[in-house]
Amino acid sequence: VSLAALALAAAPREASPQEVSRLFAENASGHPRLFLRDYRTLEESRKTATGSAMTGRILHDSGKMLGYPVVERRMTGNQMLSVSRNILYRINTLAIAYRLSGDRRYADKAVAEMRNAAAFPDWNPQHFLDVAELTLAMAFGYDWLYDLLDENDRQLFEQAIIEKGILPSYGEPRYNWCQVCHAGMTAGALAVFERNPELAAKTIARAVNCLPPAMRASYYPKGAYPEGPVYWSYGSEFNVALLAMLESALGTDFGLA
């Protein structure tokens, strides 16, 4: 309902790269900056019944992942979305497991997946959802494991996020999945902002300005999605993630919530 209400509200103001840069300087020093700013939030969440159950599931799944080989780059037709999603799930789960447990094995396995993905020749920009989800994975791992990464890994992951994630998004438009693609690009831009501030600010402003028409098309007038509930869930998950990242890193969602 709240998403659908956006269509009835006054249009959110446009964001400029200059404003994004100012907000970043005021709010986003240090890591983590994606989704939360203090890992103690995780400890607080474990005190609830839901948080305790989720912690058990995360640690269980991460324990199994320790024995898995890294994910191979394998095409299915013209896409590798299952590869990107697998990597996203592994890196996110392993990074959270490390922060919950302090067990370095989880972090090391996440970094191994990141090195492997960074070595892919590309992230398949012909099917840009693949790029978006893989960029989100790499950004999350980079941000949440930043203090454990040596300088070589930091540079490797920064370069991969920019060259295989963000820069291809400025090519000839071949996709219309605004919520998913801009969530991935925003994650990458926020995570490695200092590496290329001008590109990062432009990328984030572009995402903020793209989202209102996409949300209107997706949820107006009653919250239903024209392509059905599965795509509603898919787009909405990334829509919410994008707003959460803007709020945690920049201190505002630009009136989009």
How would you label these PLM feature ranges?
Residues 1-2:
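Sec-dependent signal peptide recognition
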Residues 6-18:
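Bacterial Sec-dependent signal peptides at the C-terminal "C-region" and cleavage site
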Residues 15-32:
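Short acidic, Pro/Gly- and aromatic-enriched capping/linker segments at domain boundaries
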Residues 25, 33, 39, 46-47, ...:
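Aromatic-lined, polymer-binding surfaces characteristic
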Residues 64:
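Aromatic-rich surface patch/π-platform used for binding flat ligands and interfaces
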